[in-house]
């Protein structure tokens, strides 16, 4: 019997709701269900909390199925309103805090917006992350080769293999200064490592992709073009992989990995520190 059903899932917080989303998604991924996600950040007063409660109740009365509610709310009066709803409510942070409180014999001091908000203690980290994002945008797709020595990692690969989204994820999620450099069709007749990258070989990391997947992605961008042909994609991938092997550049095939997985593998292989924000 197939127990998979459609469920409405709420992620609610008096802050950004990022924590509720991340932990809630992790939990829901364990179940064979199709979900409709509703994220409601900054539920900071009773009026908004009552509106959220009404939204949860309306879905319950429409579907006859209790919405799942993952919440992270500091103020008890706001929590109380959400708990009065027809949803199945789970305080995802408290589920972890309570046993830790017992283990450490220490009372928590919850403060709204502490996880992702700005305060004097994390302002320098925030500025560093913004600087990493600015750097990554300025060094996307080989736009600029200046200050490459300031990069923490330089991603290489053919067009449309995932360099840009991975670079941006590294910058936004971990504050990593990630440049990326494309190998284009004109490079393939005599593909060599550019002179500007040779002194930085310890920072280079290659991405590759299955030619069939690459062709499908390129076809969406330039239909019926040589650029998107399977023959061209096979040739480019083969040449780039040979370059990686020749120059002993670490690399992975991005075909079956999400951006999050690719970024995590890069951090691990390159020994880069994970800095969460």
From Swiss-Prot:
So which residues are the signal peptide here? none
The record's annotation in InterPro entries points to:
Kinase-pyrophosphorylase, PSRP
Enzyme class, spelled out: transferase
| List of residues binding ADP | 157-164
Q: Which GO terms fall under molecular function for this chain's record?
A: ADP binding; ATP binding; phosphotransferase activity, phosphate group as acceptor; protein serine/threonine kinase activity
Q: Name one Pfam family in it.
A: Kinase-PPPase
Q: Which UniProt keywords apply?
A: Kinase, Nucleotide-binding, Serine/threonine-protein kinase, Transferase
- The Enzyme Commission number assigned here is 2.7.11.33, 2.7.4.28
Q: Which domain of life is it from?
A: Bacteria
Catalyzed reactions per annotation:
[pyruvate, water dikinase] + ADP = [pyruvate, water dikinase]-phosphate + AMP + H(+); [pyruvate, water dikinase]-phosphate + phosphate + H(+) = [pyruvate, water dikinase] + diphosphate
Q: Which NCBIfam families match?
A: PRK05339.1
User: What does the function comment of this entry state?
Assistant: Bifunctional serine/threonine kinase and phosphorylase involved in the regulation of the phosphoenolpyruvate synthase (PEPS) by catalyzing its phosphorylation/dephosphorylation.
Which protein family is named in the record? Belongs to the pyruvate, phosphate/water dikinase regulatory protein family. PSRP subfamily.
Full protein name: Phosphoenolpyruvate synthase regulatory protein
Gene name on record?
ppsR
């Amino acid at each position: 019997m197939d127990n998979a059903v459609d469920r409405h899932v709420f992620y609610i917080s008096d802050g950004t709701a990022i924590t509720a989303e991340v932990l809630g998604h992790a939990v829901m991924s364990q179940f064979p269900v199709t979900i409709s996600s509703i994220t409601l950040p900054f539920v900071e007063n009773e009026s908004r909390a009552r509106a959220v409660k009404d939204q949860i109740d309306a879905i319950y009365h429409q579907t006859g199925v209790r919405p799942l509610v993952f919440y992270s709310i500091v103020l008890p009066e706001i929590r109380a309103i959400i708990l009065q709803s027809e949803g199945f409510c789970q305080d995802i942070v408290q589920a972890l805090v309570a046993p830790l409180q017992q283990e450490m014999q220490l009372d928590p001091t919850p403060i709204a917006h502490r996880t992702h908000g700005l305060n004097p203690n994390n302002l320098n980290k925030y500025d560093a992350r913004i600087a990493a994002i600015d750097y990554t945008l300025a060094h996307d797709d080989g736009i600029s080769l200046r200050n490459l020595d300031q990069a923490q990692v330089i991603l290489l690969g053919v067009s449309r293999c995932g360099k840009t989204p991975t670079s941006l994820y590294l910058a936004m999620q971990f504050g990593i200064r990630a440049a990326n450099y494309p190998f284009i069709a004109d490079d393939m007749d005599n593909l060599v490592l550019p002179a500007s990258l040779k002194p930085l070989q310890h920072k280079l990391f290659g991405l590759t992709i299955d030619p069939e997947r690459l062709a499908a992605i390129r076809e969406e961008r330039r239909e019926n073009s040589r650029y998107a042909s399977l023959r061209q994609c096979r040739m480019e991938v083969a040449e780039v992989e040979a370059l990686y092997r020749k120059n002993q550049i670490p690399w992975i095939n991005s075909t079956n990995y999400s951006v999050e997985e690719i970024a995590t593998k890069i951090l691990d292989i390159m020994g880069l520190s994970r800095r969460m924000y």
